[in-house]
Design a protein with these regions (language model features):
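Phosphate-binding/catalytic loops
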Residues: 79, 85-143
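Conserved active-site segments centered on acidic
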Residues: 1-75, 140
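Hydrophobic beta-strand core positions in alpha/beta domains
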Residues: 8, 81-82
Length: 143
């Protein structure tokens, strides 16, 4: 199957998923990549520490605005990548008609991406590092 539209999901859509979205878009500029949250802080920008972590890699995520995951949004995308096994299970149960397109972003490296929300900047660096490796692991599947 060809994946042309990818949705990256975390909880609030202000820390991990904006980073994952930016890294995927950077690696695959020909694809449509967006993000959403299970309990999104709708309309909020990316967390300042997420912005700082990505600035250090010369990736600007300041224009990001959080949006809520919905059934309609799920239907729009070919592949939906979440941060943990728990999120993957929840999404497959609650969006059962879309379950075949839901995967953990760290599927190929067998890792969850820890939530750095309200934690020190080093936790954002750790999440960014895992997301970078996870995105790299999808490279040949999305090309």
């Amino acid at each position: 199957m060809s994946f042309k539209k990818i949705l990256v999901v975390c909880v609030g859509n202000i820390c991990r998923s904006p980073i994952g979205e930016a890294l995927l878009q950077q690696q695959h500029p020909n694809l449509t990549v967006k993000s959403a949250g299970l309990s999104a802080l709708v309309g909020e920008g990316a967390d300042e520490k997420a912005i700082q972590a990505m600035d250090e890699w010369d990736v600007d995520i300041r224009s990001h605005r959080a949006q809520q995951l919905t059934q309609e949004l799920m239907q729009t995308f070919d592949l939906v990548l979440c941060m943990s096994k728990d999120q993957e299970s929840w999404m497959k149960q609650n969006y059962s008609s879309q379950r075949g397109k839901v995967y953990r972003i760290g599927h190929w490296i067998n890792e969850n991406v820890a939530d750095p929300y309200k934690l020190p900047i080093d936790k954002f660096y750790e999440s960014r590092h895992v997301l970078s490796r996870a995105v790299e692991s999808w490279k040949d599947k999305l090309a």
